[in-house]
Amino acid sequence: MSTQFRKSNHNSHSSKKLNPALKSKIDTLTELFPDWTSDDLIDIVQEYDDLETIIDKITSGAVTRWDEVKKPAKKEKYEKKEQQHSYVPQQHLPNPEDDITYKSSNNSNSFTSTKHNSSNNYTQARNKKKVQTPRAHTTGKHVNLDKGKHVPSKPVSNTTSWAAAVSVDTKHDVPQDSNDNNNEELEAQGQQAQEKNQEKEQEEQQQQEGHNNKEEHKQIEQPSLSSKKTTSRTSASQPKKMSWAAIATPKPKAVKKTESPLENVAELKKEISDIKKDDQKSEASEEKVNEQETSAQEQEEETAEPSEENEDRVPEVDGEEVQEEAEEKEQVKEEEQTAEELEQEQDNVAAPEEEVTVVEEKVEISAVISEPPEDQANTVPQPQQQSQQPQQPQQPQQPQQPQQPQQQQQPQQPQQPQQQLQQQQQQQQQPVQAQAQAQEEQLSQNYYTQQQQQQYAQQQHQLQQQYLSQQQQYAQQQQQHPQPQSQQPQSQQSPQSQKQGNNVAAQQYYMYQNQFPGYSYPGMFDSQGYAYGQQYQQLAQNNAQTSGNANQYNFQQGYGQAGANTAAANLTSAAAAAAASPATAHAQPQQQQPYGGSFMPYYAHFYQQSFPYGQPQYGVAGQYPYQLPKNNYNYYQTQNGQEQQSPNQGVAQHSEDSQQKQSQQQQQQQPQGQPQPEVQMQNGQPVNPQQQMQFQQYYQFQQQQQQAAAAAAAAAQQGVPYGYNGYDYNSKNSRGFY
C-alpha cells in the first residue's frame, strides 16, 4: 500500500495515548472529510480547539492536507510538525487496505473487509467513504470508486478557491474513468473530493434505501455488485458507539444499488443492462429517492458545517452539479432524474431557511435519525409518528405536498396559528426539503417553549395558592389565640405545644441546624429552607406566641422554659409583626433577615455570636454542650429583648464584667408574673425590642473594634510582637475571636 498507509498502520498502538477529547474531534472530522486521515487532522486539532473553526479552515482551503506531491510553501510548519510527530491513526477506522484490495481484486470475498476492520462505531457511511477515498491507490487496476466518477486530480493550491478548481476539473472526468494511475495527483486533491464524497455517498445510500427488496436476489448472482452492499449491511448490524456525524447520516436499510461505482468496464455494461431491466419498475420510486437524496445531503451539510453560510455552499453544490452532468452522460437512463435533482439542489441552495444555527442542530439530528421519507413527514415533534412513516406507501413527491403536513399539524397545535400562516407564506417560495425541515425545527422549538411556559405558569399558580392559604391559616390563629395565651405563662400551655417545644430543643441542639443566629455557611441562602431564624418559626409557629418576630434571636422560645414575661412580650410584638408580614417566615423565609434587612455577614455576628460555647442560655444550662469557663454569663442579655444598659466599656474591663453580672442577676430576679415594660420611647417613637437589640449590638461591636484597635496600637508602641496585643481573654470583648 502507499507509504502513508504504512506509516499510519505502523504506529497504530500510539493512538491509545490520544486523549478522548481530541479523539472524538478527530473522529468527527474524519467523517466530514473522508479523505483526510487522522494523521492529517491531528496537528490541526491540536492547534485550534474549536471544531467549527477547524471545519471552516478546511472547507475554505485555508488549511490543506499534507501530501507528497505538492507542498504549499505557507504550510511548511505543518509538514515539519507532522514529520516529527509520531503518526497516530484512528484505531477504529475501517482498515483502508482491506476495503480497497477486496474491492479491486477479488470481489467475491465481500464479507472479509468488514470482519477485519475493527470499527464498531461507524455506520455504512464510514465504510463507503473509506472505499471512495483516493488515498491509498497505487496500481493501475485500483479504480477510484467515487460513485463512478473521477475525483478531479488537480492539486489544490492555497490561492484557488476550491469551487473554481471543481468547475475547471470537470473536463477530465469522462476520459479518466478507467485508467487510474495518477495516484499522487489524487492525493493532492483535498477539498473537492471530501465535499463530493460526502454528497455522493449520501445519494447512494438514499437510492439504496428505496429499493431493498427488488434487488435481493441479484446479490447472489453478482457478488461484484453486492460486495459494497454486504459491507454496509454487516457493518450496520454490529452494535455501535457512534460519533455525532455518524449519527447524522441516515440509517442504512437493506441495500440495492442503482448507480454503482464504475468498477471496470465489463461491470459497467452489466450494470447498464440491469438498469434497463429495472427502469420501468423503479421509475416512480427513483424520482422520490432523488428528492430524498437532495434533502439528506442538505441535512448532512447542515449538521456538518453549521457555521458555514450560504456563500460557502453555493460553489460546492454547483460544482457537483456540473460533475454529475458530465458523468451521467454514460448512464443515459438516469438523465431525467439528474435534471430534477439539479433543479432541486439549486433551489435548496437559494432557500433562506438554509442557514441553520448551531442551536437547531439538535433538532436536526433527531430528525435525521428516524429519517421518514420527507413527503409523509408529519413534522410534529413526536417521535412515534416519525417512526411509523417509513412503512407507509411511498408516492413520488410533488412540490405542493408540504402544505399537507401543515394542515395535519394545525389541529394539534392550535396555539400557534399566526406562526403557521407565516410559515405557509414563506414556504410556497421554498423547495420541498428546506421547507419541511424548517417547519419541523420551528414547531419543535415552539412546542418546547410552550411546555416550559405552561409548567412555569402552573408552578406560579401553585405557589400563590399555597401562600394565600397560609395567610388565611395564620390570620385565624392570630384571632383565636392571643387573648387566652397572654394570660397563660408559657409553661402551662397544652401538652401538644410542649411536645413541640421539646422537638425544637432537640433539633436545635445540633450545630448544623443553624441554631445560633450567627451561624452561617457558604450555601446557606441558596435554598429557601435556610433563612435565618427559620427553624424556630416553623416549629414554634403553632404555639401562637409566634416568637420569631418579637425577639430576633429568640434563643429561648423553643425550649418551653422561658417565663411568662417572654410570652406576654412576644404576643404584644407578634401582633404588630403579624400585621406587617402576614405569612411568617414559614411561607417566605427570606423575609426574615435578622439584622434589619442589611445582612452583614461577618462583622455583625461573627465576632459576637458565632459560637455555641459563647452563649449558654439561662434556662437551659444543662442542655448546652459547652459552658463558659467563668461563672455562667453571656455577654449581652438579648433574651427577653430588654435593653441592657451597657456600662461604659472604655473603663477597666474588670469593672465592666462585674457590672454585667449584676445586671443579669437583676433581670433574672424580676417576678415572673409581671411583664417588663417593653416599649421605650426614643425620639418620641416607641422602639420595638428588635431595634433595641440592633442598636445595642451595633454599639457593642463598635466598642469592640475600637478597643481592639487601641490595644493593637498600644502594643505596637511598646514593641510587643505582633500577635500579642495584651487582650484579657476572659473579658467579654475579646472572647468572640478565639
UniProtKB/Swiss-Prot annotation:
It comes from the Eukaryota. Residues 298-328, 337-358 have a biased composition (Acidic residues). The modification Phosphothreonine is found at residue 338. The modification Phosphoserine is found at residues 260, 273, 307, 646. GO terms for molecular function: DNA binding; ubiquitin binding. This is RNA polymerase II degradation factor 1. One of its GO terms (biological process) is DNA repair. Ubiquitinated. Residues 69-455, 467-503, 640-688 are annotated as: Disordered. Homodimer; may form higher order oligomers. Interacts with the large RNA polymerase II subunit RPO21; the interaction is direct and serves to bridge RPO21 to the Elongin complex in a manner dependent on transcription stress. Interacts with RAD26. It is found in: Cytoplasm; Nucleus; Chromosome, Telomere. The keyword Cell wall biogenesis/degradation does not apply.
